[in-house]
């Protein structure tokens, strides 16, 4: 069977209506891209996945939205990330991408922690806020007085203790893994 017909059949089977006159593919090559999707093969057969180009674009847009320059107030940044990620996930929700979503989700949690860490600016503020969030004083002093960069500092035990996933979700973070599971179940 021709790969292009197979691609249309798989995408139509997953409830995406494809207008045949507008989207026609004559052949499929190794990194075949069709409406942002690609086909993969594993032991169970053929599956739909996201092409690498949209992945790069998605990550660069998230990087731009969670930039340290933009993070003056974290709430508007979280809202913009939520709007963009929700739209992207709703479009690409039929694709199999659980591992990639988990990787980007962990990276995005780290970016948000870094933005919050940068907002605190002074070591005294960092130590005080960590202690308020329930971190032991000695760990808070170590993390708050570090002279390493923002990215390194948010890898410390103290910062991860203070800003857990649950706390970030309660403050408005859009968890990509949870959203992907709820979207992907519907297909």
Language model feature labels by segment:
Residues 1-187:
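Non-catalytic terminal/accessory segments
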């Amino acid at each position: 069977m021709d790969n292009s017909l197979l691609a249309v059949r798989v995408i139509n089977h997953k409830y995406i209506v494809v207008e045949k006159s507008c989207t026609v593919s004559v052949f499929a090559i190794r990194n075949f891209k069709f409406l942002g999707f690609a086909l993969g093969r594993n032991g169970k057969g053929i599956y739909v996945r996201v092409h690498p180009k949209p992945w790069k674009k998605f990550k660069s847009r998230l990087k731009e939205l969670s930039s340290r320059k933009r993070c003056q107030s974290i709430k508007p940044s979280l809202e913009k990330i939520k709007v963009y990620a929700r739209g992207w996930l709703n479009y690409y929700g039929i694709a199999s991408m659980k591992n990639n979503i988990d990787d980007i989700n962990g990276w995005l949690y780290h970016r948000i922690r870094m933005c919050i860490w940068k907002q605190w600016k002074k070591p005294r503020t960092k130590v005080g806020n960590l202690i308020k969030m329930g971190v032991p004083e000695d760990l808070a002093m170590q993390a708050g007085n570090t002279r390493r960069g923002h990215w390194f500092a948010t890898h410390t035990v103290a910062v991860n203790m203070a800003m857990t996933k649950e706390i970030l979700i309660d403050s408005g973070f859009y968890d990509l893994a949870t959203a992907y599971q709820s979207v992907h179940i519907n297909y």
